[in-house]
Regions:
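Walker B catalytic acidic pair
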Residues: 73
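Active-site-proximal or metal-binding-adjacent scaffold patches in catalytic folds
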Residues: 1-68, 77-105
Length: 105
């Protein structure tokens, strides 16, 4: 397990503690995307499992920035949250209020 993987587990735990219905099918391994230049992260559904990718640029970032990005992507695994609609925004607001994040679209 690397540092991103441990942070992902924490982000999932935080969301579940707030009653946010994140998927039980999130890969525990965070993929590092070495080509991403316009985004910090993404959530991809592959074969019934969600894979979270983070930009290589976050390897040198502070833990808080990584946590916020992971939390953002974890919310996309919730039913009805593939985009940044009202439900996703509601869950982001819960995470922001509880943990001091600034998750936004």
């Amino acid at each position: 397990m690397n540092e991103f993987d441990a942070l992902l587990a924490r982000a999932v735990e935080q969301a579940r503690a707030l009653g946010i219905p994140v998927s039980a099918r999130i890969s525990p391994r965070v993929a590092v995307n070495r080509r991403a230049v316009t985004r910090f992260g993404c959530c991809i559904r592959r074969g019934g499992e969600y894979v979270i990718e983070l930009s290589e640029r976050l390897l040198e970032a502070e833990e808080r920035a990584c946590m916020q990005t992971l939390a953002h992507e974890v919310l996309h695994t919730c039913p009805g949250c593939r985009n940044h609609g009202a439900l996703w925004k509601e869950y982001a607001a819960r995470m922001n209020g509880a943990y001091g994040y600034a998750i936004s679209r």
